[in-house]
A protein has these predicted regions:
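N-terminal segment of the canonical double-stranded RNA-binding domain
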Residues: 1-34
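A mid-sequence interfacial segment
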Residues: 1-3, 34-43, 78-80
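Contiguous segments within soluble domain cores/interaction surfaces
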Residues: 6, 18-20, 38-43, 70
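Residues in flexible loops and secondary-structure boundaries
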Residues: 9, 13, 18-20, 37, ...
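Acidic, low-complexity intrinsically disordered segments
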Residues: 43-80
Length: 80
């Protein structure tokens, strides 16, 4: 599932940890810079754990929005 935020497409790709049945978030942020070109994308992850895929997906989108807004030190979309 994807969400658009400030012109960026955000896609959550949560990962289940087999050894603990918990989930960790991974989110892909992409943007089309030029019409007809391939999208540029960057993947971000966190070391936080969640009890369900739904929670990890929701937190992944929130995490990506914070990265776009410059609220997560050390992470940015400047390379896109």
């Amino acid at each position: 599932m994807g969400f658009v935020y400030r012109g960026f497409l955000l896609r959550s790709k949560s990962i289940q940890l087999v050894e603990s049945n918990r989930w960790t978030l991974q989110v892909v942020v992409s943007i089309h810079k030029d019409s007809g070109s391939e999208p540029r994308e960057q993947t971000f992850s966190s070391e936080n754990f969640f009890s369900s895929k739904e929670m990890a997906d929701m937190e992944g989108i929130i995490f990506a929005r914070k990265i776009i807004d410059g609220e997560i030190p050390g992470l940015s979309i400047d390379l896109l």
